[in-house]
Amino acid sequence: MNRFFRRSAAIVILVGAVVAVVASGATARSSAKLQVCVLLPDTKSSVRWVQFDAPDFAKALKAAGVTYSITNALGDAQKQVSQADQCLANGAKVAVLTSIDAGSSIAIQKKFAAAGGKSIDYDRQVVGGIAKVYVTFDGKAVGAAQASGVVSALKGKSKPVVAELWGGPTDQNAFWFKSGNDAVLNPLFSSGKLTKGPQKFVPDWLATNAAPIFTQMLLKTNNKIDGVIAANDNIAGAVIATLKAKHLKPIPLSGQDATPQGVQYILAGWQTMTVYKYVPDEAKAAAAAAVALLKGKKVPGVNGFRKNGSKQEPTVALPVVSITKANYKRLFTDKFLTKSQVCVGAYAKYCK
């Protein structure tokens, strides 16, 4: 079964049934005691959780020969707590957690610890949590790539106004990405080469929240925004929809996650770039960490630490790649996306 159809199956499992998917390695029975509990956050902040993370975790954990469950909380923090409770009742010893909010996530991690289990922060750091390791992409590099992409596209323009739409304020990742944005943009704002435009966090990373925020930004500036740092493709899509609704032209615009729609917008000239994070590597790294914790071994791949309250959290930080019109085909070569997902309908003419 190819990657596209595996993702479609994941959508049915995670969104249609909204139950834990308990699976096992090739030699284990499905009734075996649960070992690893993967807790994903939602289906709206990004398509990645359903289309990429869920099937990639299933593949990695099955290959590791451990029993596992994969659930999606659909943006409901209490649902995620209930899913974690069910995992514990089924014997799970390791939680791979993508946080919805810090309070509920800390509660989940404490419950696992009380039961003799361990936790992994996956993609989002739980500030104040007690995870043994944080598996993520290099957040500062993500933000720097976004800002650099927009700045490059603004070359030749005098003191362009750059607006920023950061991610959800309850997600520590949003602050990592912002720090990368700041590292590139702040010196240019200070020197007067760029003009600082409106800046806002987008609650829950939702396009439905980003659209009215960006609409207000345009009203505030009389439509004089020359470029936008959008934290991910979802938010970038809201910017594009707003520009189109106001009959405004495309402007330099960043994204993240290399979603099919994000790549389509890049090909059509509406989005400048997206940050490509090869999710199979992240899922594989988290699966390897989970297996190591199950066996009481050292977590492989730790290459640094991230401050978490008063402590330094061991971190597996993975590299990222900027995707533009010039190199989008890499996504097909890597089998991250298929041509049939991107080069279809009105966008087929842009693919060569």
Regions found by a protein language model. Give the residues of each.
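Bacterial N-terminal signal peptides
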Residues: I11-V21
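A residue-level marker of the well-folded mature domains of exported/periplasmic proteins
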Residues: R3-R7, V21, A26-K352
